[in-house]
Amino acid sequence: MLQRVGHTEAAVDLARLAGRLPSGVICEILNEDGTAARRPQLEKFAQEHGITFISVAQLVAHRLKNERLVHPVAEARLPTDHGTWRIVGYKNDVDEQEHVALVYGEVGDGENTLVRIHSKCLTGDVFHSLRCDCGWQLDTAMSLIAAEGRGVIVYLDQEGRGIGLLNKLKAYELQDRGADTVEANEQLGFKPDLRNYGIGAQILLDLGLKSIRPITNNPRKMVGLEGYGLRLGDRVPIVQPAHDENAEYLRTKRDKLGHLLAS
């Protein structure tokens, strides 16, 4: 179900995790008016009938936490404007997505390491788009880590908060017509943020990290990392001053996505 997240796949995974034949029988529970029951109704039904209840999201989180799903495939020296780093390429065994870790200095003790989990943004990271703060955050994170003398950047292939490059460009079209970044994703049929940080946590653990200081403004990212056994130290904020092109974007991240940004 890590390739396709659905109830059918979840039934098969539950059987497999129980050590049984990977097959299952599913049914849809209806409300009295004939509509499909949703989570609140299903939780009540389960409680009334003494049935164990879990969500698809909980099953995904369990697998990400307990199964190793990424492995390193290549490693090389990477000279940059922020010093010389070590770049490690990883492949996801489930969907074959490729991610990288940039390692600066010696992080072998695994303790109190400065870390940035950064989701891919072609427009911001490569073309220096002013619509978002992604490119600025990546550059600033590299500067902070270089000044610290050691740290890690995990660069995840999660373009457009997980919707992909072309869908992100479609979202930009909607933003040009007045939608904000959350509304645009929703109008395209996506949740505001589809990113998952479990793979990033697995990469950090593979590098031997135990406790980290995350460079982020996103509380959801911190919860996502802590849930995989990493100890979190003090958060390091990374706030770009607003300008005409990104002011609305930053307001939306603060007001609708819960990012820790100033008023």
Residue ranges of model-derived segments:
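Catalytic domains of riboflavin
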Residues: 1-263
